[in-house]
């Protein structure tokens, strides 16, 4: 069974397109769990209008925290395989098939993505290239984070080891990816399985800057390493 976890907040513009792209790839026994963080637009009514029994909507933490919102969704996941999805992207038709093939031999798989504008016009052919993604535990912990949630799928053992999220981690995907890398195994694949929308108000994805100061970035890394060590103590 597959559980797709989506965190939503005021995502009315793109949520139907995203959910439609996911449902087409799921079996009748799979599920989509939507944790909504108090949307004030038509996000919930749009999801309800899809009228598919595989979709389950739960109330999020209402703290405007993507990390806590995803944690709420993951707590409700029943599947043996967990996929993370953002509310505004689009899954390519072969995403589930390709990821499931790799998950037979690896505990976590991370794919590449094509970066587009809000209308799905191509901006960059590879998110990997922009973010300087590569395989390697130390590299992804210390130097560059290569774990992007919407590009990740993992087995239930990774979910169980990751939960509950430590309160001082930088983001959910960074934490999950590092847990998978140090406790289990991770495979980065070159397949571009997501159309990754980059909006004017989203964080820069040019690989050359951050909304966080150097001190904050250092603190995030120290916190991540500390909690990884605690997993083995």
Spans of model-derived segments:
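Conserved donor NDP-sugar-binding/catalytic core segment of glycosyltransferases
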Residues: 96-123
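A conserved acidic beta->alpha catalytic loop
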Residues: 21, 36-45, 115
């Amino acid at each position: 069974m597959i559980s797709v976890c989506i965190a939503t907040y005021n995502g009315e513009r793109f949520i139907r397109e995203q959910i439609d792209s996911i449902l087409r790839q799921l079996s009748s026994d799979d599920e989509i769990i939507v944790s909504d963080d108090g949307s004030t637009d038509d996000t919930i009514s749009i999801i309800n209008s899809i009228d598919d029994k595989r979709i389950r909507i739960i109330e999020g933490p209402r703290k405007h925290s993507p990390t806590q919102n995803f944690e709420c969704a993951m707590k409700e996941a029943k599947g043996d395989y967990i996929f993370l999805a953002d509310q505004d992207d689009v899954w390519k038709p072969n995403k589930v098939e390709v990821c499931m093939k790799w998950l037979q031999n690896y505990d976590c798989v991370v794919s590449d993505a094509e970066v587009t504008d809000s209308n799905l016009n191509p901006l960059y052919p590879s998110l990997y290239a922009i973010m300087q993604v590569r395989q390697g535990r130390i590299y992804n912990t210390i130097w560059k984070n290569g774990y992007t949630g919407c590009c990740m799928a993992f087995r239930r053992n990774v979910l169980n080891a990751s939960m509950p999220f430590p309160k001082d981690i930088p983001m959910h995907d960074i934490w999950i990816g590092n847990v998978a890398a140090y406790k289990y195994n991770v495979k980065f694949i070159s397949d571009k399985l997501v159309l990754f929308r980059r909006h004017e108000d989203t964080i820069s994805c040019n690989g050359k800057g951050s909304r966080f100061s150097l001190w904050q970035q250092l603190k995030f890394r120290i916190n991540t390493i500390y909690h990884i060590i605690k997993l083995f103590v």
